[in-house]
Amino acid sequence: MFHPRARTMLLLSLPALIIGVASSLVLIASMKVASVFQQFLWQRLPASIGIAYDSPFWIVGMLTLTGIVVGLIIRYSPGHAGPDPAIEPLISMPVSPSALPGLLLALIIGLAGGVSLGPEHPIMTINIALAAAFGSRLFPRITALDWTILASAGTIGALFGTPVAAALIFSQTLSGSNDIPMWDRLFAPLMAAAAGSLTTSLFFHPHFSLPIAHYTQMRLVDIASGAIVAAIAIAAGMVAVWCLPRLHELLHRLKNPVLILGIGGFILGILGVIGGPLTLFKGLDEMQQMAFSQTLGAGDYFTLAVVKLAALVIAAASGFRGGRIFPAVFIGAALGLMLHAHVEAVPAAITVSCAILGLVLVVTRDGWLSLFMAAVVVPDTNLLPLLCIVMLPAWLLLAGKPLLAANRHEP
């Protein structure tokens, strides 16, 4: 009835569905626990002892304590809470399952404690390791690389609430051939991503879009404006690229994770006092609050962008377990709103979307993911042609430039 190619794809369908659903459930459970813990640490606990949650004492104390606790987990847990996200790429080969409890605990405490990183890197690591460990027993004919691809696709679908991001990302890595077309290779990852996104949507829907005025029609001057905005965002991101490996090396000369993360948490607390509560946490909810605020001006947006960028570098350099994509989106949104406030003739839809495109491109060096994030934050079909054009000079600027990553150090 079915062609052998179709039967091969169908055989991978069941593992892909299972992995997609499981990847989403791991994400949902982790985010729910972190959210409950965050409410306790930042609302109930300070209220019960009569301290404002946004007081300098509470912000500095909470982030310093968060750093110390995460440092203790990394030092004493089996596997040292997994790989350092500042060194490893977002998608990598499976780690030992023994490292996963410590990694999950470090992630939850970091998210709840206000660290300026997202969940994407640790969740990706956890899901890939679980898929490889359990999948190889249930379906031994499927290789570790295939489990890695399915788990990462399912996680991407769950994180962003849509399989589109996974389709875009894997379309450039799973290239077809004369024997196996690209869509044959994409079939199982796309099914895993669809299962992950649908499972996530049953519980909550990631809300990325901002209330920004509709962009009506593309003009030549808008292309130039968008390219300039993207270049400014890339320049800001390259400052972080220069700082991260140097700061990472400096901090890790201390050798002791408790001391490193305690110092990192203290610095994050100082930055949190300067930037306020909006610069804490992973950045998605805070981005919505920033966009809906009627009181922030150009100077406030600039402060938020600079502080959040500094917090991202400090958190990554210290070794906190978290990802850099969600904070980069916040930074891009703040930078875009600041540029629009300075030059109101340039539509906010252009400044925000192009700034996000530039920042995410620096962080991920993935053109499809950068376009996707810019398009979902400012969901306007009239912007898509402009963003595709602006991507070209942005990609040229970053060609051959170093990545936002630290170097490995000898123990």
UniProtKB/Swiss-Prot annotation:
CDD domains: Voltage_gated_ClC. SUPFAM superfamilies: Clc chloride channel. Its main location: membrane. GO terms for molecular function: chloride transmembrane transporter activity; monoatomic ion channel activity. InterPro entries: Chloride_channel_YfeO, Cl-channel_core, ClC, ClC-type_chloride_channel. PANTHER family: CHLORIDE CHANNEL PROTEIN CLC-E, ION-TRANSPORT PROTEIN YFEO-RELATED. This is Putative ion-transport protein YfeO. It comes from Salmonella typhi.
